[in-house]
């Protein structure tokens, strides 16, 4: 085994173990748990020590319904809360300078300022620094705690730090890295890019788009459609009213209580979907797929993966299963369906159970397929 292949396998096992342990979907990685230890990101790089100089202030500006508070920040913590009926934005800020000594810090602090530009679209807030930072100044941090009208929107671009946003309108945009990101109660569409973070989103009354690699995402109570793009990340979705479309690699996705359809594409991933009213589609390689309680059609196109489908309703399906160089098992009330053996190690089942209202289509190469319908008393 060459070194590159060994690295890929180790990374895949690491991510599968994290997903399996976090969501309890499967027990596929139990023999490997002693090999790797995983710790989630907790705001790396945000503790440079005691600041050499600091100052604080308060800014107040008019901000109307539908207007946007736009924050651009390199390093710091952002907290924005919407207040019903408010007409102004209030921003409490703290600037910290980390320097070689207090004198250098104080001198540089005097050259810093908060710039607020008001326009028809809203407010643009950012820290203004000299073009060149002295070598004796190590870091500058800006923390902002803001209260805005709940009918206003936000656009936050934060390179490093924790971000917390609650009770604002949409469409809103939140980009953050290297710090936990918590978002609650967004009255409209939300677009999030949160790399190297642990992301928690609750209650979005619109569509949700989530991008970002490394860390974890918890997405709950979403009224619209959800789009997920990530690498090396675990994502859980609960109570989604619309459709889900996810493209992931070296990670996993667990979806539960979904009113629409779910479509996933991934590699080196664990894909799990349970209690889905619509259809479920998965395209994957080097991973695991588990569908349970899917209301409509199920389609799986897999390579070197294990596929498990559990029917909770009375079977009423057109069933087409095929695996090459793997096992094919039908259990419970479906055990009377016997796989046929073909060329090149293929095993196949083609049958209609009930009226065939819905379909189950699975194609797998060098992987196992299991379809079961537990008998009910």
What are the language-model segments listed below?
Residues 1-194, 198-377:
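Intrinsically disordered, low-complexity terminal regions
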